[in-house]
């Protein structure tokens, strides 16, 4: 229908020019399509073809000739006259032409009819000579899309009258095979017969019979009589070839076939045996592999069950401690109530202070009516009461300031409390990655999901593929879709309060352990040491001048506290602007610790014992003090390390070990309260001594006070110790009141006191001898004092030799008078002291069983490594019946290691299973000294393990070596207990190695080793043999377990440790009391 009419007109010249378009020159109607068969004109009769009108109206809305407005085609009218004239013309049928592009005429098969233009459409529908495309070609292309059309030849246009003839010859026509009746295309017929058709008849080349193609091969191999074949016994050695129909004759005539038959039978029997052996070996290996797989699966199932049980327990604990948003209001009420209770402490304090003042006034009024001797005693007690009142007020002020600070902190926390801070605090405490919070339920979930049982490590990389769940405290935090509830803050506060109460009780019952020396310490100059000696001499001279006046006041400052094991005393003193002010402060705040011999004695002996306690003081320790003298106005930041002898390792006959430490404590607000309670328990009671003893006691007190002033001036715990002394003075005030009441009854008991004084004077010589013996014994049991104390004693002896006999006699008389008045008090005080001594003995016996970390012990262990040999490894690395290997770090270090408790391996805080795949590949790739590293994170600590397949050095190249190292972090040291387990198919044969209480350190100041492990875990020959059960499918598994981690304060530099520690502390071997062993080379 798209063919132009002008192309098919029979008489083109007969049409007038008025039927052509004036714009394009074509016929006004030039299309057979009925919709386009029309000529359009404007109102004035100007006619154009349809295409010209459409193009013109796009540009202008008017007629091109008369300019009449024309908005669209609808405004134009049809010119029916022109349509009738054009439709009356004659045209040819389009089927006259073979193709309409060039209008090539098909004179043989083309349509010869001539028709009118208006009849053309009807004729085309009925014309029998229409040309079409070949359908067979289209069907062939659809059935074989893989064939490229460019390689094929199309059939072209075909006249409808010739379609039948074309199908008989068309190559793409579908036909049926005459042999197998299979449908094929005519173009594939020849290939089908030659290669594909199985039913095509083929003649046998030997017998000339015809068989189908699918049977011809079988015919030749088994049935064809003319085929040439080998003898049946060709395997036995017969090389005869003949036609099949002659084979029977050959078998009958030949006699050597029996030999061939026997040979064939033997070969077959041998083949059968080999096959049988192969099957047995293969099945045995399969059974062994199955057993190993089953045992490993059982072991993994057991571990899963343990993990499931742990998770169930944790879920129960978490459910019990779940908190919702509705409990936050209760928490705010709780905080407000605590604030009110603490704020009411001021009223209670004021009421108590008023009562104390009233009691003191009444006591003073009553004392004015006593006799002259009593008045003197009352004046002494009154002066001590005034001093105690001052100290009490200072202590109360310190407590009030502390309480106010706590109130402000609680108010700030209550104002800033919200759910986000609670979640953030829990995340920091348990070292958990950020989690998502789901709305009002306040539940924490993690976004990631991992499978712990599929834990596999890559031998080429340091990092592992999946993370093992980490056990931190009571919770397991794993990157999996598990829900963890938030514990209530109220329950946490209750637990913290209980822990603080337990710590306070322990501190009251036993002395705190000696803290480690501070990190930054330096040695003072000789000028400072000379200043100390000058101050000592000046203070001694001043006291000699005021000796007769202030004997009683100076002797009050001595307090006794006995310990059978370790006695630690902390001395503090405030510096004044001049010597007199400093001496008054010394008399107010001094607290010295003395050790008295506790022996069976009567009441009279106890009085003499109290008089001589100042002489029997033996304080021998490793002291660390900060020097600042009273005369200096500038505070010195340098510190002095007092040189002492080696640590006490041998106990005396009485089992006494005394230790005094001028220590710098690091304490928090909680520790300040507990320390105040501990110091308040030690009651300061006045003691009256003889005149000679009084002078020596005064000198010793002055010496200790000067050392205390050195400590107090720059110690970071100055305020803490000052509060403790003020609390002691407050407690002493109560004792002074008791002494007043006792003095009122002295007149009634005058005769009894005289008798007791006579007995006491009779036993003076015996008591002095006993005290000299006790001094000798205690000096043997303890360490010798430092150089400064030795110089002080020398000065004291010189002063004693210069004293006159007159002063001694006067002092003796004054002491006798005071003894007559205070015998009853001394008896009571000594009885109390004996009870305190017994309590201290019990506490110290308990303290001996506790574990105390000693940094010198770890330094000894580090130096052991270089002196050990392979024999010591084998001794310490023995395997127990349970497969455990206990390493040398658990051997005792002298007698102090009896205090080290064995770690409880049931409380494992971290377990990680490492799978090492393809052992042969690892063995070939990692040579001597080349390790496989894996990172591990346990809470806030980061470690990495190292496995040396071929040993760390040439000496251990035949062994497997394993180490656990701490990732480098400055100024951080820990004590760790851990173990490894090399899994075996038989769990009883698994190798377990563990290390207890090992020090891991990464400091740039101190050259400590940073890893622990074992150089000879297992021989490679044992591991490489798969029959031993360690290798399964060329893989082995190592379990890493961590039992505890303890933070350790950072040690001082090595050059100070060498000066402060005794020479005997640098031994390179460690021995135990039961057996002598050397520590193996387990640390690098």
Curated annotation (Swiss-Prot):
| Feature: compositional bias, Basic and acidic residues | 644-656, 790-799, 853-864, 875-892
Per the UniProt record, the source organism is: Dictyostelium discoideum (Social amoeba)
> Which residues, if any, are the signal sequence?
none
Q: Where is the composition biased (Low complexity)?
A: 349-375, 492-509, 537-549, 556-570, 587-637, 809-849, 1059-1084
Q: Ranges for the MATH domain?
A: 909-1042
> Would the keyword Metal-binding turn up in this protein's UniProt record?
yes
The entry's keywords: Coiled coil, Cytoplasm, LIM domain, Metal-binding, Repeat, Zinc, Zinc-finger
Which protein family is it in? Answer: Belongs to the TNF receptor-associated factor family.
- Output this protein's name: TNF receptor-associated factor family protein DDB_G0272098
UniProt comment concerning the protein's domains: The MATH/TRAF domain binds to receptor cytoplasmic domains.
Q: Which Gene3D superfamilies does the UniProt entry name for this protein? A: Apoptosis, Tumor Necrosis Factor Receptor Associated Protein 2, Chain A (2.60.210.10), Zinc/RING finger domain, C3HC4 (zinc finger) (3.30.40.10)
- Its biological function? Probable adapter protein and signal transducer that links members of the tumor necrosis factor receptor family to different signaling pathways by association with the receptor cytoplasmic domain and kinases.
What InterPro entries is this protein classified in?
Answer: MATH/TRAF_dom, Mucin_signaling_protection, TRAF-like, Znf_RING/FYVE/PHD, Znf_TRAF
Q: Give residue spans, biased composition: Acidic residues.
A: 739-757
Q: Where are the zinc fingers (TRAF-type)?
A: 122-190, 191-248
């Amino acid at each position: 229908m798209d063919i132009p009419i002008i192309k098919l007109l029979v008489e083109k010249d007969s049409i007038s020019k008025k039927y052509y378009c004036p714009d394009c020159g074509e016929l006004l109607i030039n299309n057979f399509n009925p919709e386009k068969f029309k000529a359009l004109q404007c109102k004035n009769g100007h006619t154009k073809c349809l295409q010209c009108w459409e193009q013109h109206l796009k540009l202008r809305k008017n007629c091109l000739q008369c300019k009449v407005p024309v908005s669209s085609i609808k405004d134009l009218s049809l010119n029916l006259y022109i349509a009738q004239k054009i439709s009356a013309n004659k045209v040819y049928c389009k089927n006259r032409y073979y193709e309409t592009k060039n209008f090539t005429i098909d004179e043989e098969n083309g349509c010869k009819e001539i028709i009118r233009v208006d009849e053309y459409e009807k004729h085309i529908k009925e014309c029998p000579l229409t040309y079409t495309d070949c359908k067979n070609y289209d069907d062939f292309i659809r059935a074989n899309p893989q064939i490229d059309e460019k390689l094929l030849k199309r059939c072209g246009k075909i006249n409808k009258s010739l379609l039948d003839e074309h199908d008989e010859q068309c190559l793409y026509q579908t036909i049926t095979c005459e042999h197998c009746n299979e449908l094929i295309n005519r173009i594939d017929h020849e290939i089908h017969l030659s290669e594909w058709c199985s039913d095509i008849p083929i003649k046998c080349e030997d017998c000339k019979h015809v068989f189908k193609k699918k049977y011809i091969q079988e015919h030749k191999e088994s049935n064809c009589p003319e085929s040439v074949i080998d003898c049946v016994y060709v395997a036995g050695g017969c090389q005869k070839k003949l036609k099949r129909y002659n084979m029977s004759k050959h078998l009958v005539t030949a006699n050597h076939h029996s030999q061939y038959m026997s040979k064939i039978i033997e070969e077959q029997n041998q083949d059968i045996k080999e096959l049988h052996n192969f099957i047995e070996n293969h099945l045995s290996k399969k059974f062994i592999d199955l057993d190993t797989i089953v045992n490993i699966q059982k072991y993994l199932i057991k571990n899963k069950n343990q993990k499931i049980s742990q998770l169930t327990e944790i879920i129960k604990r978490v459910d019990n401690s779940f908190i919702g948003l509705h409990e936050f209001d209760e928490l705010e009420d709780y905080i407000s109530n605590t604030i009110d209770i603490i704020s009411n402490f001021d009223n209670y304090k004021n009421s108590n202070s008023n009562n104390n003042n009233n009691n003191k006034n009444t006591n003073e009024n009553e004392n004015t009516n006593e006799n002259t001797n009593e008045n003197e005693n009352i004046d002494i007690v009154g002066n001590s009461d005034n001093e105690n009142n001052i100290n009490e007020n200072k202590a109360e002020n310190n407590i009030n300031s502390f309480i106010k600070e706590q109130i402000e902190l609680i108010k700030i926390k209550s104002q800033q409390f919200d759910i986000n801070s609670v979640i953030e605090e829990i995340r920091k405490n348990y070292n958990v990655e950020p989690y998502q919070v789901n709305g009002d339920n306040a539940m924490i979930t993690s976004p990631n999901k991992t499978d712990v049982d599929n834990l596999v490590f890559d031998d080429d990389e340091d990092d592992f593929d999946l993370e093992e769940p980490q056990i931190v405290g009571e919770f397991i935090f794993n990157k999996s879709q598990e829900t963890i509830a938030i514990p209530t803050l109220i329950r946490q506060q209750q637990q913290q309060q209980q822990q603080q109460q337990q710590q306070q009780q322990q501190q009251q019952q036993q002395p705190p352990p000696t803290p480690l020396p501070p990190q930054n310490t330096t040695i003072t100059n000789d000028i400072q040491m000379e200043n100390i000696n000058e101050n000592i001499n000046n203070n001694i001279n001043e006291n000699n001048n005021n000796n007769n006046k202030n004997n009683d006041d100076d002797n009050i400052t001595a307090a006794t506290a006995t310990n059978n094991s370790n006695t630690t005393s902390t001395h503090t003193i405030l510096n004044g602007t001049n010597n007199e002010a400093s001496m008054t402060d010394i008399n107010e705040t001094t607290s010295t610790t003395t050790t008295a011999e506790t022996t069976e004695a009567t009441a009279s002996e106890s009085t003499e014992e109290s008089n001589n306690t100042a002489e029997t003081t033996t304080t021998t320790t490793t002291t660390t003090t900060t020097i600042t003298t009273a005369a200096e106005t500038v505070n010195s930041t340098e510190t002095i390390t007092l040189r002492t002898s080696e640590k006490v390792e041998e106990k005396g006959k009485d089992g006494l070990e005394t230790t005094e430490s001028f220590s710098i404590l690091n304490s928090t607000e909680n520790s300040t309260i507990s320390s105040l309670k501990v110091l308040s328990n030690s009651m300061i009671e006045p003691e009256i001594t003889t005149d000679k003893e009084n002078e020596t006691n005064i000198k010793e007190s002055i010496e200790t006070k000067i050392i205390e002033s050195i400590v107090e001036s720059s110690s970071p715990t100055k305020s803490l110790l000052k509060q403790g002394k003020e609390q002691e003075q407050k407690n002493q005030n109560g004792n002074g009141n008791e002494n007043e009441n006792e003095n009122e009854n002295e007149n009634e008991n005058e005769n009894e006191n005289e008798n007791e004084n006579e007995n006491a004077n009779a036993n003076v010589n015996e008591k002095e001898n006993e005290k000299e013996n006790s001094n000798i014994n205690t000096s043997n049991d303890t360490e010798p004092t430092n150089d400064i104390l030795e110089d002080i004693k020398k000065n004291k002896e010189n002063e004693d030799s210069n004293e006159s006999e007159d002063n001694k006699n006067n002092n003796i008389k004054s002491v006798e008078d005071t003894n007559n008045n205070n015998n009853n008090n001394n008896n009571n005080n000594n009885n109390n002291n004996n009870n305190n001594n017994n309590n201290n003995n019990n506490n110290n016996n308990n303290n001996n069983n506790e574990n105390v970390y000693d940094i010198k012990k770890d330094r000894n262990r580090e130096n052991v490594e270089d002196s050990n040999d392979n024999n010591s490894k084998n001794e310490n690395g023995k395997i127990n019946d349970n497969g455990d290997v206990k390493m040398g770090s658990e051997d005792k270090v002298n007698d102090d290691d009896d205090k080290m408790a064995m770690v409880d391996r049931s409380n494992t805080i971290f377990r990680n299973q490492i799978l090492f795949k393809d052992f042969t590949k690892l063995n070939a790739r990692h040579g001597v000294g080349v390790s496989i590293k894996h990172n591990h994170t346990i809470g806030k600590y980061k470690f990495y393990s190292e496995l040396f397949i071929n040993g760390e050095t040439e000496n251990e190249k035949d062994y497997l070596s394993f180490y656990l190292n701490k990732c480098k972090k400055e100024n951080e040291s820990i004590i760790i207990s851990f173990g490894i387990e090399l899994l075996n198919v038989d769990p009883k044969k698994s190798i377990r190695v563990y290390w207890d209480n090992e020090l891991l350190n990464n400091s740039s100041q101190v050259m400590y080793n940073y890893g622990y492990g074992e150089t000879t875990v297992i021989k490679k020959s044992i591991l490489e043999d798969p029959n031993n059960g360690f290798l399964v499918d060329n893989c082995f598994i190592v379990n890493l377990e961590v039992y505890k981690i303890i933070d350790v304060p950072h040690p001082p530099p090595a050059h100070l440790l060498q000066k402060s520690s005794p020479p005997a502390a640098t031994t390179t071997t460690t021995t135990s009391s039961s057996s002598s062993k050397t520590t193996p080379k387990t640390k690098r």
